[in-house]
Amino acid sequence: GEGYLTKRQGRGTFVTATKIIRKVHQKDDVQSFTQACAENGMKAGARVVARKTVAADRDLASFFGLDEGSDLILVSRVRTADGVPVLFENNYYPVDGFEFLKDIGLSNCSIFEAVGERTGRYPCSSDPCRLEIARAGIDAARELKVPVGEPLFFMNAGFLDSNGERFCYGRQYYVGSRYSFDI
């Protein structure tokens, strides 16, 4: 495989080696952050950072079966456990059927529950789902209260409902020292 170029300020441009991908089968169930906190005896919190319409990039368009550049609703939130920032959540939804996301209260609640209460649809599986390590950029570092460059878990996940229909797509940043995955 081919690498890609990475610019490092003050150091130059380097070729980054292609990553090896190992498939680990994930169970066909989706646990929300709110549920994970409850199971660990912690109180989940959420603060909305942004809520806006964005143009679908190639990957998002492919997942939703839309044309590249089609409108999607992006909801970005910081999720906390007992008041400590753990997750910078970026969920993308198709506009059709999810217009209410522009107006409803999404602080200190499960977005999956909020959507389910209005649509009867809940995420039941994720495909694709990829977990890798990424360094915190300026936005993620600010929201998660970690240094720029801090290693974070980065999850790309497409969520499907019980009928196998596309539900939402998440691009999530987790603080590794504050979160663990049971795969």
Map each language-model feature to its residues:
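Short glycine- and Lys/Arg-enriched binding-loop motifs that mark or flank ligand-binding interfaces
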Residues: 6-8, 79, 160
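Short, surface-exposed charged micro-motifs
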Residues: 4, 90, 171
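A short glycine-rich, His/Asp/Glu-containing loop-to-beta-strand
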Residues: 46, 75, 85-91, 174
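HTH-adjacent hinge/linker in prokaryotic transcriptional regulators
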Residues: 1-68, 98-124, 180-182
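Short, charged beta->alpha transition segments
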Residues: 34-35, 79-81
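Residue-level recognition of beta-strand microenvironments
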Residues: 51-53, 78, 158
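C-terminal regulatory/effector modules of DNA-binding transcriptional regulators
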Residues: 65-68, 81-84, 95-97, 102-183
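Short loop/turn microsegments at loop-to-beta-strand junctions
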Residues: 73-75, 154-155
